[in-house]
């Protein structure tokens, strides 16, 4: 059940609910129960095992919440009895899920791209990027010390990029505003991003001279759309994919689920991105963290292809108990290789084994047995949780490296992956 938890504290909280359950039950593909909290009314928790999907009446923003996790723990230990039918609160939610699944429209006929429309968009993008490059030049000439790095200023430039149909560039500018807020080394961060964006503008101007994969990368970073249908038509990569981590984020009620996969045989990384507006109820089904699945992945085109879509699965997912080796040197080299292929990448997933989380003079590091260290960053509670899980001993950690710091998304302890 640990693989379903959004983080270690949620799992710990779920384990404390063992004596709080009543009216639990299960049918073939669902479990439910009432969990008494601090209020007068117990929380109603439901898990659709076929998803899995979760529902709870509590106000928690974590997904799944501790009540859904606690219900799964009750079920896994055999304390949820079989019932003839679910109660009304569970039956209604399950029925709505079935109706939603049945109402999924049939695949539409593949639309043929209009060359005139594509050309018009390319011209709008080119015009917008030319304005962006002029703005970048003005910032460099005026000096970064006088640059307005406020959210309002950068959001104004980002809005212009949205109008120019370059949402990838707009997202980079908005992310920059959040990154520089309060950062001591913000001039270095700003300069690096401005250089990256200038290089993207130049590459877009000379796309006809680029190789096919690099041209695809430029289009992806600018924000040209790629249809799901076209991706699924690309050759599949069949592997035993290990689910190394999963994280749900939210921005303006848009929930994004990122799932990191690692091919057991070839060591190739992939990420799956799923989106849901209003609530974290994702339609796509992915194997839980800590499981390996024999499946096909279809990768989005690019010079360092990483994002993919899940295709045919050839067997049920099952837990894995070992990780491939991965030291700090190999992690840095894999990042270097990826950026060498796609210079606009900001981070790359890596595994580092036998490293110890260390807190030194207000900063976090991952230190291997030879004394080599990687600077690490992340939410303070998450980093202290990581240290607590390790117990001060070497562990294997999965995360992303961005040339500046390592950000963990899971830890491997005693043959089990725990999401952070």
Protein language model annotation of sequence segments:
Residues 1-420:
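Long, low-complexity, compositionally biased intrinsically disordered regions
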């Amino acid at each position: 059940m640990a693989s379903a938890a959004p983080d270690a504290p949620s799992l710990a909280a779920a384990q404390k609910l063992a004596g709080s359950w009543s009216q639990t039950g299960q049918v073939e593909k669902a479990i439910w129960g009432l969990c008494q909290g601090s209020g007068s009314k117990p929380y109603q928790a439901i898990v659709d095992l076929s998803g899995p999907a979760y529902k709870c009446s509590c106000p928690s923003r974590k997904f799944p919440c501790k009540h859904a996790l606690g219900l799964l723990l009750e079920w896994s230990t055999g304390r949820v009895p079989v019932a003839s039918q679910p109660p009304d609160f569970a039956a209604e939610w399950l029925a709505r899920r079935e109706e939603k699944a049945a109402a999924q429209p049939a695949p539409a006929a593949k639309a043929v791209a209009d060359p005139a429309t594509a050309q018009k968009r390319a011209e709008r993008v080119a015009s917008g990027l030319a304005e962006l490059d002029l703005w970048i030049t003005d910032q460099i000439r005026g000096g970064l010390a006088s640059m307005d790095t406020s959210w309002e200023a950068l959001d104004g430039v980002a809005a212009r990029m949205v109008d120019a149909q370059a949402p990838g560039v707009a997202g980079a500018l908005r992310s920059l505003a959040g990154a520089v807020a309060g950062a001591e080394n913000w001039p270095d961060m700003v300069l690096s991003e401005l250089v990256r964006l200038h290089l993207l503008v130049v590459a877009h101007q000379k796309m006809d001279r680029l190789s096919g994969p690099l041209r695809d990368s430029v289009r992806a970073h600018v924000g040209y759309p790629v249809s799901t249908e076209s991706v699924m038509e690309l050759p599949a990569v069949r592997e035993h994919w290990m689910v190394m981590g999963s994280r749900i984020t939210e921005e303006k009620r848009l929930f994004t689920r990122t799932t990191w996969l690692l091919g057991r045989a070839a060591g190739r990384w992939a990420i799956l991105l799923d989106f849901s507006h209003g609530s974290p109820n994702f339609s796509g089904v992915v194997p839980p963290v800590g499981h390996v699945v024999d499946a096909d992945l279809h990768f989005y085109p690019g010079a360092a292809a990483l994002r993919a879509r899940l295709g045919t699965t050839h067997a049920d997912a099952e837990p894995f108990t070992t990780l491939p080796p991965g030291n700090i040197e190999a992690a840095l080299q894999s990042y270097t290789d990826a950026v060498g292929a796609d210079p606009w990448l900001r981070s790359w997933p890596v595994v580092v084994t036998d490293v110890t989380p260390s807190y030194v003079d207000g900063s976090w590091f991952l230190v291997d047995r030879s004394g080599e260290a990687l600077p690490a960053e992340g939410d303070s509670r998450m980093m202290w949780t990581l240290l607590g899980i390790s117990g001060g001993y070497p562990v294997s950690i999965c995360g992303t490296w961005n040339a500046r710091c390592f950000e963990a998304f899971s830890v491997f302890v005693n043959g089990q992956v725990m999401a952070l």
